[in-house]
């Protein structure tokens, strides 16, 4: 009898130990990422799509020096935020390696090519549109519940830091994709912006209804200033006027929508990151940030290295830290570090109603 009791006690202890390994530590915080190629860290590698970053020289400055599916020479913004949190960057949701304790650290649902609208990026075929990313979020919650129970899952999701980056493709790869696009015939630009913002509000509200309580929402960058647009639309290196107009309409309305949404839910659940201004700082004065250029991409071909894809046959700069743009559309790791630093410590001009460092301090007190 005594031997049986001892065995039961040992079994109970083992179960307790295994369970404690699965339950996140009190100071750990899940990190959930949604959006497009600016934050995708490899989901599209698992899909039959042309929107991929799985070839050299992508990843040339990543710790492994190999392509990872990130549209960067090295780390991207989710990686840099994770670095600040002292955690591993969340894995792509489609990765078969995302399970058990890795699942409890969060997940990256982002997919290159998508937009707020489901008809954005149709030329890329098989991508994870934002509606599907939210379905995966619901699936993620079920998987986490299976590991730690529903109560602990709700605590994890409510306490998670969420990052969402959307909007640029709705202009570059939809409204302005071709002359007389379907959306440009349906809407004037101001009306299109209002429509896109209204659809984005539905996405963010759905995210809140699914349990997200700390959501960093980044705006678009200065879309007319990326090398791809300079190559197609610029005569003398000036930013493309129409896309800059789109950014100047979209971003202030996004901030106002987030303010209204916070008032609706009665908390500062949503944080607006003014990434347009963050980019313009180093685009307008690249030398002040240690760049030799903010017009020419490090990797590419044609004018401004802005034509086509970054491939093994492309022009490649020897020092990526001297270039604000890595490829025709995406910032270099160094530029991403500047943006991440503003997300962390930026003034109200950049982060509204507060920056990430303040969020982390406030949340640590609750």
From Swiss-Prot:
Q: GO cellular-component terms in the record?
A: extracellular region
Q: Which UniProt keywords apply?
A: Glycoprotein, Hydrolase, Lipid degradation, Lipid metabolism, Secreted, Signal
Residues bearing attached sugar chains per UniProt: 118, 355
The molecular function GO annotations come to: hydrolase activity, acting on ester bonds
What is the top EC class of this enzyme, as a single word?
Answer: hydrolase
Which Gene3D superfamilies does the UniProt record give?
SGNH hydrolase
The Gene Ontology biological process terms listed for this entry are:
cuticle development; lipid catabolic process
Q: Which residues form the active site?
A: 37, 327, 330
Q: Name the Pfam families on file.
A: Lipase_GDSL
Tell me the leader sequence span. Answer: 1-28
Q: Where in the cell is it found?
A: Secreted
Per the UniProt entry, the Enzyme Commission number(s) are 3.1.1.-
Tell me which family the UniProt entry assigns to this protein: Belongs to the 'GDSL' lipolytic enzyme family.
Question: Which PANTHER family does its entry note?
Answer: (RAPE) HYPOTHETICAL PROTEIN, GDSL LIPASE/ACYLHYDROLASE FAMILY PROTEIN (AFU_ORTHOLOGUE AFUA_4G14700)
Q: What is the name attached to this protein's record? A: GDSL esterase/lipase At5g33370
The protein's organism comes out as Arabidopsis thaliana (Mouse-ear cress)
């Amino acid at each position: 009898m005594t031997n049986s009791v001892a065995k039961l006690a040992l079994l109970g202890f083992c179960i307790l130990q295994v369970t404690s390994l699965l339950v996140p530590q009190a100071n750990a915080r899940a990190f959930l990422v949604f959006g497009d190629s600016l934050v995708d860290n490899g989901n599209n590698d698992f899909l039959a799509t042309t929107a991929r970053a799985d070839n050299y020289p992508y990843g040339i400055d990543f710790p492994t020096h190999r392509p990872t599916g990130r549209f960067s020479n090295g780390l991207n913004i989710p990686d840099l935020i994770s670095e600040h949190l002292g955690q591993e960057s969340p894995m792509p949701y489609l990765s078969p390696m995302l399970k058990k304790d890795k699942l409890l650290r969060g997940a990256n649902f982002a997919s290159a090519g998508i937009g707020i609208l489901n008809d954005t990026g149709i030329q890329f075929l098989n991508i994870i549109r934002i509606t599907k990313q939210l379905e995966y979020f619901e699936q993620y919650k079920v998987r986490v519940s299976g590991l730690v129970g529903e109560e602990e899952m709700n605590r994890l999701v409510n306490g998670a830091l969420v990052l969402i980056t959307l909007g640029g493709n709705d202009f570059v790869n939809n409204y302005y994709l071709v002359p007389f696009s379907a959306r440009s015939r349906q809407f004037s630009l101001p009306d299109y912006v209002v429509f896109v913002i209204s659809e984005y509000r539905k996405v963010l509200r759905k995210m809140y209804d699914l349990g997200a309580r700390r959501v960093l929402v980044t705006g678009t960058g200065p879309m007319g200033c990326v090398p791809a647009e300079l190559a197609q639309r610029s005569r003398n290196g000036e930013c493309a006027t129409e896309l800059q107009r789109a950014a100047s309409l979209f971003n202030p309305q996004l901030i106002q929508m987030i303010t209204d949404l916070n008032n609706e839910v009665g908390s500062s659940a949503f944080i607006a990151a003014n990434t347009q201004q963050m980019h313009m700082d180093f685009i307008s004065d690249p030398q002040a940030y240690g760049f030799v250029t903010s017009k020419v991409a490090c990797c590419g071909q044609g004018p401004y290295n802005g034509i086509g894809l970054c491939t093994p046959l492309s022009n490649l700069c020897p020092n990526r830290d001297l270039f604000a743009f890595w490829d025709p559309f995406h910032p270099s790791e160094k530029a991403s570090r500047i943006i991440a630093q503003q997300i962390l410590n930026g003034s109200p001009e950049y982060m509204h109603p507060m920056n990430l460092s303040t969020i982390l301090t406030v949340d640590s007190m609750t």
